[in-house]
Amino acid sequence: MERRITTIILLVLLGITTVCAQQPKQVSGTVYSAAGHVLVGASVTGGGHTVVTNGDGYFVLKTDAELTSITVSHVGYRAQRVKLSPAQNEPLRVYLKTATIQLQEVLVMSANARELVAAAISKIPKNYSQQPELFHCFYRETAQKRNHYIMVAEGVVDMYKTAYDYQRNDDRVAIRKGRRLLSPRKGDTLSVKVTGGPVLPIQLDMVKQRDWLLNEEELGYYHLEMEMPTTIGDRQQYVVSMRPRRKMPHPLYFGRLYIDQETLAFTRAELSLDMSDRLKATQMMLVKKPLGVRFRPKELSLQIDYRLEDGVTRISYIRTLFRFNCDWRRRLFATAFTACCEMVVTGQDATTERPIRGRESFDQRDAFFDKVDYFLDPVFWQEYNIIEPTESLNRAIARLMKRR
């Protein structure tokens, strides 16, 4: 995490998508638990493309392939294959059942967590891609002042990744299409920059960028413990919890690592930065702020997902959430801000050439907001897969559009 990507905190709203045909077929719906609660971040796959459900549990999947079924999965639930009729037009309501833990699975609680993680690290070259690949993605940044959205930026992004056993880091990201929207009110904007941006899947790909977490020295700073196993899709997962065991010059994390029981591939990480030392947390989170503004970190949480497909485990989704307070000196009250960045991989292709070169590449010092245009076209994402905006975000976009 020492590498940093700057993203202006005032932007918010980015979507990731994959290029489809001129008139893509689409299916939409909402994913629920068996108890009727909406499931956020559920994975929906079909026709060679993938999307995730938004904060309302809603999704729209577009593809130019013949779509006869979709597969829906979520951590802790059994995956469900939903058959589609040729004339499927109405939104689906998909209910997932909680995965049951069998008796023999409880025995994994006695396993050695540190040895398990070490074994998973040793299998990275085998479990992950051994050839260069081009990923098609949708990226979204949002920023909120208190409970109100003040910025949205989103775009279609291509991401080139070399093989996971490749020694040089030549991974790159390029923006193919994007848009932005910023509150015109003077009091809404604050030029604070925090770590983030479209290169998050490169910098936070913990399986490939092992220097910030998955190495023997760094893991030595943590207590590792086995937790109750769970499932992702229909695959059983070991769950390893981690917490700091000593004070270090840099902040550490609390969190969980999910490891596939069959392949020993890392499939998911849920991490939260230790906020006990506010100065260290600030140094990790903050890139730039105006003189006289006091920055007070509250939360930095990360979610990193990988998906097994055709025998290869690939990165599939990344989300970061920042919460912090800012105030000017001599002012009585601080203002709460929330910034969220998320990127979903909607498709990928094998490639023998480097498709992103030179000026196309998004630099870690760039701000995504400065690279895209303002919201204008009402059907901007017509042919792309994206993370559908929630109802509250849609209302915020409409409100900000009226103020322009």
Give the ranges of each region predicted by the language model.
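Structural motif
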Residues: P24-V40
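Short Pro-Gly-centered beta-turn/loop motif in secreted/extracellular proteins
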Residues: H37-L39, V60-L67
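Hydrophobic beta-strand segments
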Residues: A42-G46, I70, V108
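A short, solvent-exposed loop/turn motif at the edges and junctions
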Residues: G46, V72-V82
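Short, acidic Ser/Thr/Gly-rich low-complexity loop/linker segments typical of extracellular
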Residues: H49-Y58
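Short strand-edge motifs at loop-to-beta-strand transitions and within beta-strands
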Residues: F59, E90-L92
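Surface-exposed, low-complexity/disordered segments
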Residues: Y95-Y222, G233-Q236, M285-L286, P290-R404
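Extended beta-strand-rich segments in extracellular/periplasmic secretory proteins, especially
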Residues: R210-Q261, A265-L273, R307, T313
